[in-house]
């Protein structure tokens, strides 16, 4: 694992917090079989855990989730609900329309991030990685930990906001270089929790509400390569 930190800006006083993190993920479409949905319920409700993570890390406006059972149902939902910001799909070998759905969305010019979760095995990894033109943005190994969902959300928010927040404003960036699905699926949640907790510690040094919001939004971006 290699991490590269860009230079820290000396002063954010001239940057208003509203200009940072302009893109936020507010609504997530979850594609998940009844069985996997049941397992997630057994592990703990994802929505509740993500909400608790947001509250625990002093983060506002947690996203809402829309649950469907198949790629076909997802297509219908996307037609009826144009405000979907992200799609997270639990890999299901029976549902053969998942990869065509992701590819079709990209072909239609829709820039909705499409993330695939899988219970890691070499056989499944080989099948997934063979879909080179699938339209899937990232593949993650699922261990039943809601921290990973939070990390995925923040990863794509950081990616969309990087050009302005980093290049124009001077926000720091941490580059995680890792090609192992299992490793980056483990590293990212821990890295985000560390960064967000440190940001909350820095809030104690601020003097007013605007300074707090500025520091909160100017936390280092995390990019995965």
Predicted regions, residues:
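Non-catalytic signal-transmission and effector/linker regions of two-component phosphorelay proteins
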Residues: 1-66, 131-138, 142-223
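Conserved phosphotransfer microenvironments
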Residues: 9-10, 36-52, 60-63, 67-114, ...
């Amino acid at each position: 694992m290699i991490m590269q930190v860009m230079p820290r800006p000396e002063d954010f006083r001239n940057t208003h917090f509203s200009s940072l993190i302009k893109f936020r993920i507010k609504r997530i479409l979850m594609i998940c079989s009844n069985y996997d949905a049941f397992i997630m319920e057994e592990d703990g409700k994802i929505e509740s855990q993500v909400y608790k993570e947001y509250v625990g890390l002093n983060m506002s406006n947690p996203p809402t989730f829309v649950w469907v059972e198949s790629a076909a149902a997802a297509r219908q939902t996307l037609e009826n609900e144009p405000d979907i910001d992200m799609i997270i799909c639990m890999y299901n070998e029976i549902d053969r329309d998942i990869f065509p759905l992701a590819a079709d969305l990209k072909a239609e010019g829709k820039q909705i991030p499409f993330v695939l979760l899988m219970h890691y095995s070499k056989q499944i990894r080989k099948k997934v990685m063979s879909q080179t033109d699938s339209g899937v943005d990232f593949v993650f190994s699922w261990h039943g930990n809601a921290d990973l969902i939070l990390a995925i959300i923040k990863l794509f928010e950081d990616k969309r906001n990087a050009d302005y927040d980093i290049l124009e404003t001077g926000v720091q960036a941490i580059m995680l270089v890792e090609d192992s699905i299992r490793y980056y699926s483990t590293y990212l949640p821990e890295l985000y929790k560390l960064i967000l907790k440190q940001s909350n510690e820095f809030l104690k040094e601020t003097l007013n509400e605007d300074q707090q919001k500025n520091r909160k939004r100017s936390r280092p971006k995390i990019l995965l390569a």
